[in-house]
């Protein structure tokens, strides 16, 4: 019986590594933009009285996530001036993408969709590109932090990233106003 308890405690020790907490948080920051582009945008356009087909076309923004592998090699090679030297290559990209997402969200909040749908969709596309670029960088940082030779930690890191992502998505869904609470 003692051996089983030791095995279970050995299994969980990988999840309590400080690197896993960082990976969990990185997963969470990857989840927030996904909900904003998806659920929030759909709700916003619906509240503005736009048609279902228009809302459906706006959903094509998600297509960016399917093609982020195309610019992943560029992310590995291009260094962000000042940030790369100060905080490192991957963290520099993450901070830059967070800044792009923040600025885009501020601009997004100032747009009336029924008056300027093209600009709204364009900024949504910028958010999606920045978010998918951030996802590339978060995954690369996770792999670098854990190390390819630590297979159990690598598996725990992948799990923590997914848990972080889903936690952010779930939390955002729970805290967003629903149709009945939108004034």
Place the predicted regions along the sequence by residue.
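Helix-loop boundary and gating motifs at the non-cytosolic
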Residues: 10-62
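Cytoplasmic membrane-interface "Motif A"-like loop-to-helix N-cap segments
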Residues: 78-97
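Cytoplasmic helix-loop-helix junction between adjacent transmembrane helices
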Residues: 135-160
């Amino acid at each position: 019986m003692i051996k089983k308890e030791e095995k279970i405690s050995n299994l969980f020790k990988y999840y309590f590594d400080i690197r896993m907490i960082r990976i969990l948080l990185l997963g969470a920051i990857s989840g927030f933009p996904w909900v904003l582009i998806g659920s929030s945008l759909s709700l916003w356009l619906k509240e503005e009285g736009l048609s279902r087909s228009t809302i459906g076309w706006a959903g094509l923004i998600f297509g960016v996530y399917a093609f982020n592998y195309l610019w992943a090699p560029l992310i590995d090679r291009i260094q962000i001036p000042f940030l790369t030297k100060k905080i490192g290559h991957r963290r520099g990209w993450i901070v830059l993408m967070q800044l792009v997402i923040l600025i885009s969200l501020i601009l997004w909040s100032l747009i009336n969709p029924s008056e300027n749908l093209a600009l709204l969709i364009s900024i949504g596309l910028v958010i999606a590109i920045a978010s998918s670029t951030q996802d590339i960088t978060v995954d690369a940082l996770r792999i670098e932090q854990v190390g390819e030779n630590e297979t159990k930690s690598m598996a725990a890191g992948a799990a923590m990233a997914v848990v972080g992502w889903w936690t952010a998505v779930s939390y955002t869904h729970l805290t967003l106003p629903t149709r009945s609470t939108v004034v």
